[in-house]
Amino acid sequence: MYDNEAIVGQDVAESGLRREDVFITTKLCQTRAGYELAWQGIEESLARLQTDYIDLLLIHEPYDEALDMYRALTEAYRQGVIRAIGISNFNAREYLDFIGSCDVIPMVNQVECHIYYRRKELQQALVTQGTQIQAWSPFTEGKKPIS
């Protein structure tokens, strides 16, 4: 999605670090929408990252095909290919609608969240259902002072 998986995989391989000491998160975007394409995306990410598992895999946005994508993630999670599965950029309504059809509740919802955009309704929905919030812009992308 961000065209950085190959370099991350190479750097981890060359770093001398043990794989279990590095936490790798990546995402599937719309070009991998749907069940089959999601599986293809998982396999491609594993190859580019030069690893046999991904620590956290997210669906980038609430695409129309997100449930089909998530079904592939769920199967990969059950097989141990992905250690944690989640979503990104789902608001409270989208999240609650989505989890109504999930066998495994997303472990993470990665969203914009910071002092100026606290997402209280979303945070409450996530806490109630057992999903962790992960901020993708905790310091407002440097656009506003936080002191």
Language-model features: locations:
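Short acidic capping loops at alpha-helix termini that bridge into adjacent secondary structure
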Residues: 18-22, 52-56, 83-84, 105-108
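Alpha-helix termination/capping residues and helix-transition junctions
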Residues: 16, 48-51, 79, 103
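Glycine/small-residue-rich loop that forms an oxyanion/phosphate-binding "nest" at active or ligand-binding sites
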Residues: 13, 27-75
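Short beta->alpha junction loops/turns
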Residues: 1, 15, 30-31, 62, ...
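N-terminal binding-site loop/beta-alpha segment at the start of enzyme catalytic domains
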Residues: 1-22, 139-142
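Beta/alpha (TIM)-barrel catalytic core signal, keyed to glycine-rich beta->alpha loops juxtaposed to Asp/Glu
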Residues: 61-147
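Short beta->alpha linker loops
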Residues: 2-3, 30, 89-93
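Generic beta-sheet signal
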Residues: 25-27, 135-136
